[in-house]
UniProtKB/Swiss-Prot annotation:
This is Leucyl/phenylalanyl-tRNA--protein transferase. The gene is aat. Its main location: cytoplasm. InterPro entries: Acyl_CoA_acyltransferase, Leu/Phe-tRNA_Trfase, Leu/Phe-tRNA_Trfase_C, Leu/Phe-tRNA_Trfase_N. Transmembrane segments: none annotated. One of its GO terms (molecular function) is leucyl-tRNA--protein transferase activity. One of its GO terms (cellular component) is cytoplasm. It catalyses: N-terminal L-lysyl-[protein] + L-leucyl-tRNA(Leu) = N-terminal L-leucyl-L-lysyl-[protein] + tRNA(Leu) + H(+); N-terminal L-arginyl-[protein] + L-leucyl-tRNA(Leu) = N-terminal L-leucyl-L-arginyl-[protein] + tRNA(Leu) + H(+); L-phenylalanyl-tRNA(Phe) + an N-terminal L-alpha-aminoacyl-[protein] = an N-terminal L-phenylalanyl-L-alpha-aminoacyl-[protein] + tRNA(Phe). GO terms for biological process: protein catabolic process. It is found in: Cytoplasm. SUPFAM superfamilies: Acyl-CoA N-acyltransferases (Nat). It is an enzyme of class 2 (transferase). Its EC number is 2.3.2.6.
Length: 243
């Protein structure tokens, strides 16, 4: 069966409606265009994101169902809380965004690295614009885990995470959910559900539900200071929001 897919024009930033995305492969919406910051930003504003393999053209996606976290309801496993009390990883926001993006690429097998040089450069430039943010987890002075994504009002579009030490990415997500919700963040987009996300408590929204949430949350801002460079946990206060 032939698949008809929209090719994006390099001359405009227009995307087809997310509701025209394919069912198989789930969410594939368009191909082509470029990775101009204006295009990427326009995509996230519509619930669309780029993802493509080493041999692919630029592909644009809007899957359904959509994996999400409600940061106000996120609860880490008791074992993770116990681990953090003992090991006292440090957790920061926007201290090493470029390093986090690089590690998210390097910790995957070469044939699965969708975060190529062009993508890493684009997200790095979005960070300079204050649109891409990271959470870092440190063991001493070593970066051992983290996550990064794009902020769209009260919605955070999580892009990738990595872990080089036990529980590091789980601790990054835990502290970020608490921090984001305290600053009136409402939803964290995780794109496509997988067993790991499900084990962490992710749920799903239909495309219609996700787009409705996006339209509402993107017009509202998180509280001032949410994405300032800061520490969320240090050895003197590693679990300030424990039960």
């Amino acid at each position: 069966m032939a698949i008809y897919l929209t090719e994006l024009s390099p001359e405009t930033l227009t995307f087809p409606s997310p509701f025209t995305a394919l069912d198989d492969p789930n969410g594939l919406l368009a191909f082509g265009g470029d990775l101009r910051l204006e295009r990427i930003w326009a995509a996230y504003q519509q619930g669309i994101f780029p993802w493509y393999g080493p041999e692919d053209p630029i592909l644009w996606w809007s899957p359904s169902p959509r994996a999400v976290f409600d940061p106000t309801r996120f609860q880490p496993a008791k074992s993770v809380k116990k681990f953090q009390r003992k090991h006292q990883y440090r957790v920061s926001v926007n201290h090493a965004t470029s390093q986090v993006i690089e590690q998210c690429a390097l910790t995957r097998p070469a044939d699965q690295r969708w975060l190529n040089d062009s993508m890493r450069h684009a997200y790095g430039e979005l960070a300079k614009q204050g649109r891409c943010h990271s959470v870092e987890v440190w063991q001493g002075e070593q970066l051992v885990g983290g996550l990064y994504g794009i902020s769209v009002g009260q919605l955070f579009c999580g892009e990738s995470m990595f872990s080089l030490a036990t529980n590091a990415s789980k601790i990054a997500l835990w502290y970020f959910c608490d921090h984001f919700s305290r600053h009136q963040g409402q939803l964290i987009d995780c794109q496509v559900m997988n067993p790991h996300l499900q084990s962490l408590g992710a749920t799903t929204l239909s495309r219609e539900q996700f787009i409705q949430s996006l339209l509402s949350f993107k017009e509202k801002q998180v509280l001032s200071g949410c994405f300032e460079t800061q520490w969320l946990a240090t050895p003197t206060s590693p679990c300030a929001f424990e039960d």
